[in-house]
Amino acid sequence: TITPNGITRFMAIFQCNNPTEIGSIRSARNDFIPLAAGFKSIYVHWGGEREALQKLNNGIIDNVDAMKYEGTVFYRKKGVPVPHNGFTDINKILDQSQKLNYNLENTFTGYPHEEKELKKNISNLASEVVVDYLDPYGVRWTYDRQDNIYKRERDGNPEIDKNANEQVSAKIVAVIKTTSTYLNQDYITVKTQGGGEAIIYQGGISIPGKWKKDPAHLDSKLYFYDNNGKEIKFLPGNIWVEIVI
């Protein structure tokens, strides 16, 4: 999602892969709460904006706040500048979640998989995806035909995963368009419930359509549909959602 001054913020969702080290962990955002709820996840954060923290402290969704467990579940990594130096690992999160009596069973239903070869034509080829965030946060994804993935660049440079020392990649890139409103002079809230336009990129092609998430239910699933109203099937692999306003 995006902050008022154009800085982009990540939210990582771990389901199949459990990395040993997770970070940097940053503050909770109001926009992320509906997304975390929709994926039936435990929301891990380091403090947060006032409205988001109020909701989380009232138990709107299961969450683990590093402000309460620094030095035990979370730690500050040496050599990494503040505030980017907050880290943890998946086992510590699972142990603390169990102590808090959170449900550790994954109940998210997932997305339908596309097992057939995607149909390509001159109108749907997509070797590149450009997301025009404000400088220096602009993003470019380039399709790697050999590995059938998209590789991420930020501000013209490859985005590197520090754990794997490899360029960040995704099997599917979903760009969803939405709107935002100001909470106050310091924070905006980006609409992550309701719906809007979307473009799905996978296998070197683009699929225009819509995203929908029922605004009446916080834990509703985030759906992706093509322009015929049919749910889009994804190639097996990781999905990166770019939210633009």
Residue ranges and their predicted role:
Residues 1-245:
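A surface/extracellular/periplasmic glyco- and lipid-processing/surface-interacting theme
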